Amino acid sequence: MSIAIENNVALVTGANRGIGKAIVESFLDHGAKKVYLAVRDTNSTKELEEKYGDKVVTLQADVSNTASIKTLAEHATDVDVVVNNAGIGTPQSIISDDVEEDFLNQLQVNAFGLVRVANAFAKTLESNKGALVQLNSIASIKNFSQLSTYSASKAASYSLTQGIRTELSPRRINVLSVHPGPVDTDMAAKAGFENAAATSEISEGIVSALKAGDFHLFPDDMAKQFEKEYENFSNNIVTSDFSE
């Protein structure tokens, strides 16, 4: 199932900076009718509002709060493409006093946030024959030292993405799982990654992958190295139907 961004309405969580902001810009550059900017701080989208005018609509949303996401869905019933981009990640050793609190916080946003968004928008996306895009990571399939809790939360979100795809595909909803490597964002800088990919590589890749009807997207150079090694397992295990 494929969907073109042109003349469609999108919603992006965490739309005020980094990958989320780049997705908004790419969608509008490719002819999106309107993009909802779902953010915790509604004052953080002024730059996008000044640039795009009535093509963008800012809505308050917190993916760690179920009621907030339900309200968000009630205000965006015309949406065709929902991008769950909001996420958190901090360097954290597993062997530490505060690891449990840190891990729970990341699960609340990175894993349960996806569950909240998928549940809130499923009926709308079914009615509009739309798409759900989940920002996962190469850390979804490989645990990185000092990012172990982040990697585990993204592994959980990837597993959930597979389950969501199984449930939503029969309802004619396309699901796209995006797995970038380090991207030039505040999060990557804090983690000490160098030579990070430009945010536009991810956002432009999403536009193309949606049009192609793909399930996986490994958009940047490092991610493509993972894709090459992961492809056989993905084709034979992840996307296979073992119910037959």
Predicted features along the sequence, with ranges:
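Residue(s) in the substrate-gating loop at a strand-loop-helix junction
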Residues: S137
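The beta1-alpha1 cofactor-binding region of Rossmann-like NAD(H)/NADP(H)-dependent oxidoreductases
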Residues: L59-T71, E100
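Conserved mid-core segment of classical short-chain dehydrogenase/reductases
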Residues: G89-L104, Q146-T149
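Conserved glycine-rich Rossmann-like NAD(P)H-binding loop of the short-chain dehydrogenase/reductase
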Residues: L28-E47
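Conserved glycine-rich cofactor-binding loop
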Residues: N16-R17
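Active-site helix of classical SDR
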Residues: A118, S153
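C-terminal helical subdomain
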Residues: S177, T185, A189-K228
